[in-house]
Amino acid sequence: MVKERCPKQAFQDSLEDIKERMKEKRIKKLAKVATVNKTLCTKVQILNSGSTAIKNYKANNTALALALEAEKLKTRQAQDLILGLKREHQRLIFEIFMLRRRLQSQQGRDTAESKLASLKDIIAKVTHNLLETASLLEPAHLLCSSANNNTPNPSKVEEKLSSGASAILRLPSHAPISDTLPKNVIPNRLEPEQRNFKDKVVLEANRNTAGVNRQSRGRRSHSNQPSFTSRLEECNNEDKTESGATMNKNVSLRRRASSLNICLEESLPLEDTNVNSEHTVVETERPFPTEEFSNESRTDREIDNVDNPASPLKVKCFPHANGSKMTGLASEAKQTSNKNKEEPRVGRERVKKGKAERVAVSQMKKPWENSKPRARSKSRDRSASKKSVAKEKMNSSLNSGDAFDFACEESIHVTPFRQNKQEESQNESSLEISSSEGELDDSLYKPYKDKSKNKNLKPDIAPVPLRSRSKRNTARKNSIAENELMSDVQAEANEKKITRNGLKRKSENSFTESAETYREKSFMPTCINTNNAIAENPEVKVFSDECNGGIIYTADEPSGASTPRISLSDVTNLPGNTDAKKHINLLFNEDEMKRSSTPSRKRRCKVSINYAEPKLSGKLRRGDPFTDSEFLQSPIFKNESKRNSLNRQSLSRYNEVFVGCRR
């Protein structure tokens, strides 16, 4: 086809088209810019809103802070006001309290003043009444003081009464009573100098009597009893004469205990102690002591004399006026002291002996021993109740360091081979007896171990074996002991020595003969084929070859009935399951039964030595948590069985929280 040519456009048209296109492009660009501006505006607006909110929050916070400060200031001011008011309140309360105190003190003063005024009035009235009574009693005193024979004229008495009444009326109120009394009436008091002197004498006398009483307990006084009583009588007679000259009959002349003590203890001059007639003391008569008091004082005196027979000065002084009573008491005290001199000495000796015994018992007594024995019925036989308790062996291996002490361990942990307690008690008693004999003996000292060995070397009694720690050591020790026993028996039985070749032949013959005799005698079915077993078993041949030195021929019995003696190590080397070993053991038992009438103790422990390398189970110890084989077989290390695993799988389907089957 022929291509049609497009019409050509003019230059202007093309320019217009280009302009239009450019305009469209601008519009599009503007539209795009407008959309971008819108998004930016929204973002800016969001940012502006957040900032404004923050500003608002800050403003609010500042306002709140200011308000809080203002309120705090107000509260502080209020608290200050409250404190000020409280102070004022306390001050007012204190003032009120002080005012109340003043009021109470004023009221008390008023009452005290009123009481004092009333008391003064009462005292004035009493003094007035006393003066009146004194004036009335003056003529009666004059009547009493006048002589008994001379009776006064009534006119003189009336004159004296009238003069005394006029003197009383003229006296002032403040005059003392002692001034108003006449000179003949003596008051019941001494002058101060004489009173002080008498008090001093009494105090010294009391001190001296106390010293004499203390000294009389420890040592004898050198003064004699008769001089003491005579001195008492002299004092009493002098007092009687002087008082009769100065005092009337109705005035008592009895002295107190203190004045008597002055006479007894102090060697004071009687002229100084006696008072003139003008200054004598008028005392009201006191009743004599009752019978009860006198009896009590006598018993006290007797007790004192018994306690201190060597002190004759210690006598109870009674306030009696008569000297005869004092002498009688002194003589009674002397008689009782002479009678009871020997009795307190015997009592003292007994008391001293009892005290010494108590001290010795208290020193010997131990703190863990009971002071009182337990009460038991007499009907019970105490000897039967007492049981022989085996004494505990002392641990002699103390301070031995870290080494393992077999003897100490054996004494603590008793093995099953030590269950025969009777033999132990017998051995202990024999050891105690031997030790006591050894102490008394003057022979040479032998150690304890030698004695025990010599006692245990009897052929009939087998030694009690200790608990073996290693099998080889025990086998070696047993073999040595057996060899020693055999050598002793051989020396006693036959002193001749036989060569090895002769021993081989005789041992083979005797061994076969003994087997035949044992087969005839025995009733056990297991020991019938012993001869065949011995003939066929090569170990027995080796045994018979090896233990030539151990076989001993006993010459006490005839050669046909002779039995071989084999050492313990050869027996233990045989295997445990062979019939030969059983046969040899039975032969040993039979031979021992023949020799000793008492049945010998069978061996409980058969030691077999195996020289093969021990297994793990043999090396492991029972009870040791580190090497115990049973501990490894505990449920922790066991493999779980199928049943347990199935049960656990079935149970695992269930949830712990929700009890239901999982699907």
Curated annotation (Swiss-Prot):
GO CC terms, sorted: kinetochore; microtubule; nuclear speck
One Pfam family recorded for the sequence: Shugoshin_C
Location relative to the cell: Nucleus; Chromosome, Centromere; Chromosome, Centromere, Kinetochore; Nucleus speckle
Disulfide bonds: none
Extent of Basic and acidic residues compositional bias: 231-242, 280-304, 339-358, 366-394, 443-453
Chain segments carrying region Disordered: 207-250, 278-401, 417-478
Composition bias, Low complexity: 427-437
Keywords: Cell cycle, Cell division, Centromere, Chromosome, Chromosome partition, Coiled coil, Kinetochore, Microtubule, Mitosis, Nucleus, Ubl conjugation
Residue ranges of coiled coil: 8-29, 110-132
Single biological process term from Gene Ontology: cell division
PTM field: Ubiquitinated by the anaphase promoting complex (APC) at the onset of anaphase, conducting to its degradation.
Summary of subunit composition and partner proteins: Binds microtubules.
Family indicated by similarity: Belongs to the shugoshin family.
Summary of the function given for this chain in its UniProt record: Plays a central role in chromosome cohesion during mitosis by preventing premature dissociation of cohesin complex from centromeres after prophase, when most of cohesin complex dissociates from chromosomes arms. May act by preventing phosphorylation of the stag2 subunit of cohesin complex at the centromere, ensuring cohesin persistence at centromere until cohesin cleavage by espl1/separase at anaphase. May regulate kinetochore microtubule stability in mitosis, possibly to sense tension on mitotic chromosomes.
PANTHER family, sorted: SHUGOSHIN, SHUGOSHIN 1-RELATED
Protein name stated in the entry: Shugoshin 1
Gene from which the chain derives: sgo1
